């Protein structure tokens, strides 16, 4: 067992008879597997060693997307979170190493998208005398034409000091205008109990600035509902925030106590009430959409990077990281395509190439199917008349009989000696 769970809770009964690799020892995974196969139980949980090197071998789920972790750990001490117990304080990877990793992924390995990730993207560099904009400016320099970068989750406190710089980066033509800022609650009282180190006003300051300065920005956020100290009034504040911004991506989480965390010692809200609040916010989220009917007919340039679950469409994103589906027959993975929106759903827009006329449809096997069936029927009827039931046409299909008779006459003329013509009636 490797990762956060084994590091944070190694004494759990179900972990007693397995080998464990902590988050600071992940570069020794091959060694641990080898010892385990020999029948030895290994437990590597040391915290005070340097972090595993950034350039460990990896296997991409999507060969077109490089997921680059820029740091490990965080600067916060949220009362509900157990990740800090496993990953510890912030450790930022060196700027030069990250830039080289990105350069190699783009130029040597052919990826088309770079996704930056960490426990808190905005905190990068604060332990090494740098700030996130320093890294982002260097990364955009190595992004080739036709490729894009997407920023991961960043908590409000560490973006407040750099609103102008972050907006500038998000407006860069090779960076998606996408920002994931988890608010968790819109109640200042609950945020204080969570030790989130910001207020609702801080979050709104960020959101309002980005909306005003980054055209068509896509803002995603998270909510934790039924935190032990959340009142109905607190919950309503969170509902009001969702109504105000209508977040296109909203990750709704019902609070669950994590053993060993300060919040786990607090009295839980009744389960029925917790589910009621979760259902209410989920219903609110379903009641609106970014993709309205008014958007049908819009033109977009999208980068297609994967196949949709229906296996009929390619999944692409425009500059605002809006999801746009394109019929697979028109897609080439890793390339851009100009499309026109033809339909909308809650989570995406459906499109076809802008070069296709309104009444023009792609040629596919489905379009040839009726013709194939018709031809098969004719062949079958011809075979029945000729080999199984002579006179079938005359008896059952008189409207075809004359045509068939003409065909027989033509055949007889073809094989008869032309010097002694015979006429058939």
Curated annotation (Swiss-Prot):
Domain of life: Eukaryota
Domain TRAM span(s) in chain numbering: 293-355
Cofactor(s) for this UniProt protein: [4Fe-4S] cluster
Predominant location category: membrane
Residues engaged in binding [4Fe-4S] cluster: 74, 78, 81
SMART domains: Elp3
Cofactor binding: number and manner: Binds 1 [4Fe-4S] cluster. The cluster is coordinated with 3 cysteines and an exchangeable S-adenosyl-L-methionine.
EC numbers: 2.8.4.5
Gene Ontology molecular function: any one: metal ion binding
Radical SAM core domain sequence ranges: 60-295
Chemical reaction(s) catalysed: N(6)-L-threonylcarbamoyladenosine(37) in tRNA + (sulfur carrier)-SH + AH2 + 2 S-adenosyl-L-methionine = 2-methylsulfanyl-N(6)-L-threonylcarbamoyladenosine(37) in tRNA + (sulfur carrier)-H + 5'-deoxyadenosine + L-methionine + A + S-adenosyl-L-homocysteine + 2 H(+)
InterPro entries assigned to the protein according to its UniProt record, in alphabetical order: Elp3/MiaA/NifB-like_rSAM (IPR006638), Methylthiotransferase_CS (IPR020612), MiaB-like_arc_euk (IPR006466), rSAM (IPR007197), rSAM_horseshoe (IPR023404), TRAM_dom (IPR002792)
Keyword annotations from UniProtKB, A to Z: 4Fe-4S, Iron, Iron-sulfur, Membrane, Metal-binding, S-adenosyl-L-methionine, Transferase, Transmembrane, Transmembrane helix, tRNA processing
Membrane-traversing stretches: 362-382
EC class name: transferase
Localisation per UniProt entry: Membrane
PANTHER family (alphabetical): RADICAL SAM PROTEINS, THREONYLCARBAMOYLADENOSINE TRNA METHYLTHIOTRANSFERASE
Family affiliation: Belongs to the methylthiotransferase family. CDKAL1 subfamily.
The protein's name: Threonylcarbamoyladenosine tRNA methylthiotransferase
Organism of origin: Caenorhabditis elegans
């Amino acid at each position: 067992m490797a990762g956060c769970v084994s590091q944070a809770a190694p004494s759990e009964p179900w972990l007693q008879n397995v080998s464990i690799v902590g988050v600071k020892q992940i570069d020794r995974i091959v060694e641990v597997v080898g010892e385990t196969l020999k029948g030895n139980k290994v437990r590597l949980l040391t915290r005070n060693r340097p972090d595993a090197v950034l350039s460990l071998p990896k296997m991409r789920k999507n060969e077109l997307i490089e997921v680059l972790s820029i740091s490990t750990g965080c600067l916060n001490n949220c009362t509900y979170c157990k990740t800090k117990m496993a990953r510890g304080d912030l450790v930022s990877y060196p700027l030069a190493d990250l830039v080289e990793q990105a350069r190699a992924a783009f130029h040597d390995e052919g990826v088309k998208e770079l996704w930056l990730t960490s426990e808190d993207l905005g905190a990068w560099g604060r332990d090494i005398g740098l700030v996130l904009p320093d890294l982002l400016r260097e990364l955009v320099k190595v992004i080739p034409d036709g490729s894009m970068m997407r920023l991961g989750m960043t908590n409000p406190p560490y973006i407040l000091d750099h609103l102008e710089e972050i907006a500038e980066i998000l407006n860069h033509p090779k960076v998606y205008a996408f920002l994931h800022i988890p608010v968790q609650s819109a109640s200042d009282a609950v945020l204080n109990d969570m030790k989130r180190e910001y207020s609702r006003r801080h979050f709104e300051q960020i959101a309002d600035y980005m909306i005003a300065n980054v055209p068509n920005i896509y803002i995603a956020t998270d909510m934790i509902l039924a935190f032990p100290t959340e009142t109905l009034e607190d919950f309503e504040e969170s509902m009001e925030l969702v109504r105000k911004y209508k977040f296109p991506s909203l990750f709704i989480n019902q609070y669950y106590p994590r053993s060993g965390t300060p919040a786990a010692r607090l009295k839980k809200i009744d389960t029925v009430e917790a589910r009621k609040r979760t259902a209410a916010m989920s219903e609110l989220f379903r009641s609106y959409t970014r993709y309205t009917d008014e958007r049908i007919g819009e033109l977009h340039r999208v980068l297609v990077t994967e196949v949709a679950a229906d296996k009929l469409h390619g999944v692409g994103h425009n500059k605002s990281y809006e999801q746009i589906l394109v019929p697979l027959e028109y897609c080439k993975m890793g390339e851009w395509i100009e499309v026109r929106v033809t339909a909308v759903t809650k989570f995406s827009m459906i499109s076809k190439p802008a070069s296709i006329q309104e009444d023009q449809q792609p040629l596919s096997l489905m379009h040839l199917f009726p013709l194939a069936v018709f031809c098969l029927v004719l062949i079958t009827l011809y075979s029945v008349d000729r080999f199984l039931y002579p006179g079938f046409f005359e008896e059952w299909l008189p409207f075809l009989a004359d045509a068939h008779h003409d065909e027989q006459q033509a055949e007889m003329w073809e094989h008869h000696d032309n010097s002694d013509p015979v006429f058939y009636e």
